[in-house]
C-alpha cells in the first residue's frame, strides 16, 4: 500500500519537526540562562569604581583586565546572545508553523483512511 507508506513518511516528518522544536526550545532556554548571567555580570561591573581591579579567567589563570574593556566585552556578549535568542525564536516560529501544517496533513490523511475503511465496511455489509 503506497498510501500507507506515504502516511508513515508524513508521520516521520511530523516527529522530526517536533524533535527540532524541542531542540530549539532547549537552545533558547540555554541562551536565556546565559543572558541572565551576562546581565548580572554587567550589573556588577556597572557598580564598580573606575579604579577597581577586574580579573578575567583565562584557562586556569586569572588575568587582570581593564574595567572598560570588561564592560565592552560583556556588552558585546549581551548583544550576541540577544541576537541568537531572536534567531532561535524565529526558528521556533517557523518550525511551529511547519508542525501545524504537517499535523493537518497527517490528520487529513487519517480521515481519508477512516472514510475508506467505513466505505469498505458498508460495501461488505451490502454484499451480505
UniProtKB/Swiss-Prot annotation:
Keyword terms: Chaperone, Cytoplasm
Gene Ontology cellular-component annotations: cytoplasm; prefoldin complex
GO biological process: chaperone-mediated protein complex assembly; protein folding
Domain of life: Eukaryota
Entry annotated with the keyword Transit peptide: no
CDD domains linked to this entry: Prefoldin_6
Keyword Transmembrane helix: no
Record's subcellular location: Cytoplasm
Known role: Binds specifically to cytosolic chaperonin (c-CPN) and transfers target proteins to it. Binds to nascent polypeptide chain and promotes folding in an environment in which there are many competing pathways for nonnative proteins. Required for positioning of the mitotic spindle.
Family statement drawn from the similarity comment of this UniProt entry: Belongs to the prefoldin subunit beta family.
Name the record gives this protein: Probable prefoldin subunit 6
Organism: Caenorhabditis briggsae
Gene that encodes the chain: pfd-6
